[in-house]
Amino acid sequence: MSYASEVKKELTSLEVHEKNAKAELMALIRMNGAIGINNRQLTLNTQTENPAIARRIYSLLKEFYHLEAELSVRRKMKLKKNNLYIVRLRTGVKELLNDLSILKDDFQINEKVPEGLLTEESELRSYLRGAFLASGSVNNPETSRYHLEIYSLYESHNQMIADWINKYNLNARTTERRSGYIVYLKEAEHIADFLQLIGATNSMLKFEDVRIMRDMRNSVNRLVNCETANLNKVANASMKQINNIQFIDETVGLGELPPKLREVAEARLIHREVSLKELGELVPGGPISKSGINHRLRKINQYAEKLRA
């Protein structure tokens, strides 16, 4: 089961009060429902690839609207051949759609929730939960870049969802996608907060655990890379020093160096892998500070370059 499926499974197990059930259904049916006419009667088909969501819709209709829907399943034949679960309602459709403010009196669809309809925070959260169940997705935090999105057919509805999410300072952004629009979150902290907001507490905790481990691994990797780079830098500098000292020795002899440079050159040939600080403590005339050792080694390098010129 994917992480997104785990989140949705948790959400479909939540108990809700009547007003919140209405808000959740308002999103589920507005975003996944299709109105039809059969024998001069309105019908409503709500489709999903997730059986838990289909059961959720069926249960909410029965418990809070006392409507008996039909559950059916068929196999999609295009692209991914997943099962498609259909919740079909043949009676009470117009009354339901009117109560959910989805259908206007002239049988036009309300593209978004009318202003002032959902006034309580619990209702807003429930609508966002329904919207995520209907057409939301979230990447697995273990294997992917952080990303959560909700798809909407209508731009006005998409912007409404973004505005509601941003009431909680989650930096939701919008963009056009295929034949519709999406609102999305990219920051890990905001995704975790959104999961908590819609009631997916266990999924949020799992997300946070994975995020913390990823951040720790990334920090360790950065430290290791930095340390490796520093070691390589030191090793390369040491090799250059040794090559120059050997060149001087083979060309004119180390005795041609001033005494202070000669003692550092001889110490470096003997102690090739030590740091500058350690080398300063090993020089016979020492101890010499790290900056002092570095200064003398630069002089030795310059002497070698003059010999090569």
Curated annotation (Swiss-Prot):
It comes from the Bacteria. GO terms for molecular function: DNA binding. InterPro entries: Homing_endonucl, Sporu_reg_WhiA_N_dom, Sporulation_regulator_WhiA, Sporulation_regulator_WhiA_C, WhiA_LAGLIDADG_dom. Pfam families: HTH_WhiA, LAGLIDADG_WhiA, WhiA_N. Residues 275-309 bind DNA. One of its GO terms (biological process) is regulation of sporulation. Keywords: Cell cycle, Cell division, DNA-binding. Belongs to the WhiA family. Involved in cell division and chromosome segregation. This is Probable cell division protein WhiA. It comes from Pediococcus pentosaceus (strain ATCC 25745 / CCUG 21536 / LMG 10740 / 183-1w). The lineage of its organism: Bacteria, Bacillati, Bacillota, Bacilli, Lactobacillales.
